[in-house]
Amino acid sequence: MIFRSFALSLNKISCTRKNIQVNLLIFRSFALSLQTKAYIMKKTYRITLAVIALFILATIGGSVYMLNFSLSPDPNHTDLDSTYAILYKHFPDMKPWVDSMQTNGYLRDTFLTMPTGERHHALYFRADSAKGRTAVLVHGYKDCAAKFLYLGRMYNRDLGYNVVMPDLHAHGLSEGNDIQMGWKDRLDIKRWTEMAAETFRDSVYGVNIVVHGVSMGAATTMSLSGEELPAYVTHFIEDCGYTSAWDEFAVQLKAQFSLPQFPLMYTTSLLCRIVHGWSFGECSPIKQVAKCQRPMFFIHGDADDFVPFYMMQQVYDAKTHGKKAMWVTKGTTHASSYADYPKEYTERVRQFLAE
């Protein structure tokens, strides 16, 4: 009995030791599992941080690239020989007219010093029968005044207007380091209307001014239209302008790079505000048009996919005060309405200004 009891006790001790060993194994396994999970979580955390950091760096890099791509001026923007060559290629009959204007001293250059201290350039010429009627003509993105002399000829030769054709900031012979998409340009054009009034005011008829812009020049014109202006600025004509810098850049981001608006549009707009003092959303011709109370003529080609045709209806609808007119040029691509319909363009502008 004593032996059996002793043996039974040994068995119990043995079982207890085995249970302890099993429990130790379970504990070690659990501890190892916790260590493995901690390692995996730590690694996942590091990978997540790395991915976030890469995303942020890529977004910043993309924003810097997009801003430079969009707002850096043409490095050859002062090369007027190339500019005139392009003008004559598209409008061969312009060369004799330009040569005559230059030879006789009618086509002149002038400069204004802007509040920033930068000197801006413009071409100007008068019409003997103008009676104070003057057109301030605004060119497009990465273009210059000389390339739009076809429009200057229309106003001067066909409509009898004095003409002022500014080079926008960082375009043509105007100083500057960045393209302003028409936003800050609106205030520069306001200065040019003041110059035009001083230069061409008639002693009998006074002066009245139409501001006419194409593409980015049209966006500039619409942006100007919402400002407080002297009474002598009487009419506006916008040819294929965009609703806002945001909308136009979003269209090009998708068309050229197949990218959505988020996140680049948001970060690049913020960067633009930091670097240049304005944001893509702030540059909003459509909001300015909503404040315009003077007559405006809207022109757009229905085959325009650079500044999409649907934007015309949006800016037209936004103008709820004062007279307005619309002309859709059939089959016309971006900024080509005059080239496709020169006679009708001239007559429609004449009719609008006469109303």
Where are these regions (language model features)?
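Hydrolase active-site cap/lid region
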Residues: 223-278
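Conserved alpha/beta-hydrolase
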Residues: 155-175
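Alpha/beta-hydrolase active-site loop
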Residues: 179-200
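Short beta-strand/loop motif that positions the catalytic acidic residue
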Residues: 292-293, 298-300, 304
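Short alpha-helix in the alpha/beta-hydrolase fold that links the catalytic acid
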Residues: 151, 294, 308-317
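An N-terminal hydrophobic leader/cap segment in hydrolases
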Residues: 44, 55-112, 123
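The serine-hydrolase catalytic nucleophile loop
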Residues: 141-154
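Acidic catalytic loop of the alpha/beta-hydrolase fold
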Residues: 303-307, 335
